[in-house]
UniProtKB/Swiss-Prot annotation:
Protein name, as recorded: Ureidoacrylate amidohydrolase RutB
Gene that this sequence comes from: rutB
PANTHER family: ISOCHORISMATASE-LIKE DOMAIN-CONTAINING PROTEIN (PTHR43540:SF6), PEROXYUREIDOACRYLATE/UREIDOACRYLATE AMIDOHYDROLASE-RELATED (PTHR43540)
Native source species: Caulobacter vibrioides (strain NA1000 / CB15N) (Caulobacter crescentus)
InterPro entries in UniProt: Isochorismatase-like_dom, Isochorismatase-like_hydrls, Isochorismatase-like_sf, RutB
Any one Gene Ontology molecular-function term assigned to this protein's record: hydrolase activity, acting on carbon-nitrogen (but not peptide) bonds, in linear amides
Record family assignment: Belongs to the isochorismatase family. RutB subfamily.
Length: 238
């Protein structure tokens, strides 16, 4: 195990993580909830209809709920992302966009025309957050149109205005939107930690392991919900 990183401020506490523990100040930390929508976490949602295994989504929802309770009590900022597009799919891009070719939601709708207008469209059930993760007063909701939460969104300005330096990631899918957002945050000088049991992959189990390996080796840190709650659950309310 590597040596702990030197604390950045007096308010920091040490969060157990891989490859080394790191100091985290709740006042400059945001928990990012990536795409916990019916599309990704509910039977009959886009990911399920596209043939992906979503059996782990219910456990992830439960874990995230516990993390958010602790985060709010500790004074952390909570940010929810919802992925999708306008109901006419202009934001998704046409054939001139690689997103048109690679988005599995768009490909599923082209293969099944009866689903057109239902997947990842604002105003539709698929786009909405799952019932168990309803935002609370003070939480922030942001919209994104691509895998990374930093692309064409207000995330960076929201974080900088609040002095946020550390991002704790939860949500679906680890190997797509979670990793993409954490990577872009790294390039913008944000510290990123993913809670591995509060995320779920799109695809076989090995892609979860590969994404976590990439994160802890090159772009950030990996911790668990138990370590997060154990570290911050004893703090006085923020």
């Amino acid at each position: 195990m590597s040596s702990p990183i030197t604390p950045l401020s007096p308010g920091c506490v040490m969060l157990p993580a891989r490859p080394e523990p790191l100091p985290v100040d709740p006042k400059t930390t945001a928990v990012i909830v990536i795409d916990m929508q019916n599309a990704y976490a509910s039977p009959g949602g886009y990911l399920d209809l596209a043939g992906f295994d979503i059996s782990g989504a219910a456990k992830v929802t439960h874990e995230i709920k516990g993390v958010l309770e602790v985060a709010r009590s500790a004074g952390m900022t909570v940010i929810y992302f919802q992925n999708g597009w306008d109901d006419g799919y202009v934001e998704a891009g046409g054939p001139g966009s690689p997103n048109w070719w690679k988005s599995n939601a768009l490909k599923t709708m082209r293969a099944r025309p009866e689903l057109q207008g239902k997947l990842l469209a604002r105003g539709q059930w698929d786009y909405e957050l799952v019932d168990d993760l309803t935002p609370q007063p003070g939480d922030i909701r942001l919209h994104k149109t691509r895998y990374s939460g930093f692309f064409n969104s207000q995330l960076d300005s929201v974080l900088r205005a609040r002095g946020i330096r550390h991002l704790v990631f939860t949500g679906i899918a680890t190997n797509v939107c979670v990793e993409s957002t954490l990577r872009d945050g790294f390039m913008l000088e944000y510290f990123g930690t993913v809670l591995e049991d509060a995320t779920h992959q799109a695809g076989p189990d090995f892609v979860q392991k590969a994404a976590l390996f990439n994160i802890e080796t090159f772009f950030g840190w990996v911790s668990t919900t138990a370590d997060f709650k154990g570290t911050f659950g004893q703090l006085a309310p923020g």
